[in-house]
């Protein structure tokens, strides 16, 4: 079973399913959705002491997310939504819970794990599930 340390490295996005549907479900606008649909970002995962860093790089927008496992924090999404977020790691899977703060926003659960040498992520909000696959760069 994988440990969080196995996630460390640079990953390139190679496959996406239902990403536009997921973005629509959480309220991302049409122009941003269309731009994001064609991106092939790089995800860099690092550990600095007890702080995990997930940095995503693309031609459209770069994002940085830092967290400590088991500690709730306020997260600002790339399109300016705000969440109370919590990361946990159990049975080889990293779970990222984004709990809405504003009534008109939607909560999500993002799950990350390793499978056959790939980094797999699912994003779920309501009944919509997106799957993304990343390969080591």
Curated annotation (Swiss-Prot):
GO molecular function per UniProt: fatty acid binding
Signal sequence, start to end: none
Sorted UniProt keywords: Lipid-binding, Transport
One of the GO biological process terms: fatty acid transport
One Pfam family of this chain: Lipocalin
Superkingdom of the source species: Eukaryota
GO CC, alphabetical: cytosol; nucleus
Family to which this protein belongs: Belongs to the calycin superfamily. Fatty-acid binding protein (FABP) family.
Protein name as it appears in the record: Fatty acid-binding protein homolog 7
